[in-house]
């Protein structure tokens, strides 16, 4: 409901570094504005991030280019869909760039095209929403045994996969992806 989103943006206006022109947003909604994306909506694959980025790109008034401020603003918008957000997914969509977070600060990273080509989204046509899975994950993290396995097995594999991606090491990336897939079984 775009009208509910507009009300949310107005209610949270004090949280933005860059103001959001809610009036123009409402006028466009009244005029039939819609969102089109190649990311399937409602599958938990990043559509809320793309949607948040599109709103921000079109309706943010001041253009403070500080990445941390933009990420924070985008987190406020995406929180409408999930209850909370790091802002990273919409930042990736907004800037059409990859980022590495170092000490909580986003740093833009170039990814070699042949590395990006290793990934694709498959539309299963099975709608899903990310929020219930996020809640389930948080509740399962209360299990100390699982939490420890994630910290000692999954997290290192994810970090190693990211590093392999950044240095364009396909063999290492495949090896780490195998570890990630195996962990999920």
What do the PLM-derived regions correspond to, one by one?
Residues 36-58:
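Glycine/serine-rich anion-binding loops at beta->alpha junctions
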Residues 1-21, 25-30, 36-37, 41, ...:
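C-terminal nucleotide
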